[in-house]
Amino acid sequence: SCSFDAMKLLSFVPLIAPSSSADVYDSKTILSITSDDAFVDVRDVPKLLENASFASNPEVAAFLKTASIKTLKSSGLQVVSTSDDTVSSADLCSYLKNAASELPGLECECSPNFATKEQTTDDDLGVNDPQAWRQRAFERMNMKEVWRLSAPYATRTVGVAVMDSGLDFSDPEIAPYRGFFRKRSGGFIDGGWNFVNDSSNFTSVNQHGQRCARLIAARRNNNLDMVGMSSNVRLVSLRTHEDNGYGGWANLAEAMDMAVDIGVDIVSISLGDFMSRSNGERIFGKAFEAATDKGIIVVASAGNDNSLADTHYPSALPGVIAVASLNIQDPLQLSSFSNYGGYVDIAAYGAGVYTGSNVLSSGTSFPCPIVSGAAAILLSMGVKPKYVAGILTHNVDRFASPLKPLKKHAGALNPLKAVKMAIDYPILRSGR
């Protein structure tokens, strides 16, 4: 049967502050149609109805013949340019719901392209001498020792997609890591892609994605500003939001499709919000499942609502590493804003984290790239992708959090323990 549930805001907001409600982003429709688990093109539905001697709405049938429709190959999702001037999203979803009720075996999911809004907090600009010594989170994780131990085992460069506002590779901190990726479908991606306007102009005045990228890979030992987690990376910017922070779920689905097409190793997503489990997993889960099935490591922020993260997407999706935020203090504790619960896999520092250019940042947006960077270190050592999440979540520092519990046995990221395990157990690594 075809479901068309009303959904709360799907605000894929850069997670700096709690999100707020919004409306639909534009008039497009996101849908998935299958028959016996096989992909069905929405353009074929009128013919299927006709062949089965059922009436087909002529207005919708005519619209589908000429409509602009994007098909996301890896997930089977389609994005249809519906509009109130032609056929609306509600009309198309109603049409498909009726078709599914008439045609045995036809399954359809249909949703408007809900809006998202970025929200930011004031950053602490009280320091005018930005240097690596300000990165207390990195000091607490013993990153100097992590880099020393892991360096002799570095065997490969890791492709990391930053799904966010766009990146600016003129920034000397990330310029050396601009990636060039060949698409399996043909052609290539140089540095990134803008899914807001479907162009190769992916830079943004919005600095949210830039901060996340610096935490992953700001260049070490270049006498500039700060340092990132891993130096053996190629970055690609999958821009899903406008400069003002707005974006739609279709952008996220298209970006994940691209991540699969170019074969990245890690997707870092400092975005998300709550939605119904049925819509989260049935519709948008397909785009993410296509990536995790290929062995791509997907890391996502657990959210800033001081709430259970059970229906916070995409972090609640199966196979996605959900990351909560820790305060930089002893004893370890979750940040006051951080989401929590049995769907949270790991926590890392996310309150007052230095992200370059005299900026201290707080929110679950920032432990996410720290975990992504730790995953990149393991992959660069030749650790097999299927073991990375397990190594990270097994080698944590567990801490008491009775009021804000995590998944059983979850704890704080400890990259040093993780790297030592990868070194001590060569079977976890390939080619050694």
What are these regions (language model features)?
Residues 34-35, 112-115, 162-166, 216-219, ...:
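Active-site-proximal beta-strand/loop segments in catalytic clefts of secreted hydrolases
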Residues 145-193, 197-249, 265, 310, ...:
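Subtilisin-like serine protease catalytic core
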Residues 201-210, 303, 359-371:
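Gly/Ser-rich catalytic serine loop of serine hydrolases
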Residues 244-264, 274:
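Catalytic-core regions of hydrolytic enzymes
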Residues 73-76, 94-159, 167, 171-173, ...:
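Protease zymogen maturation seam
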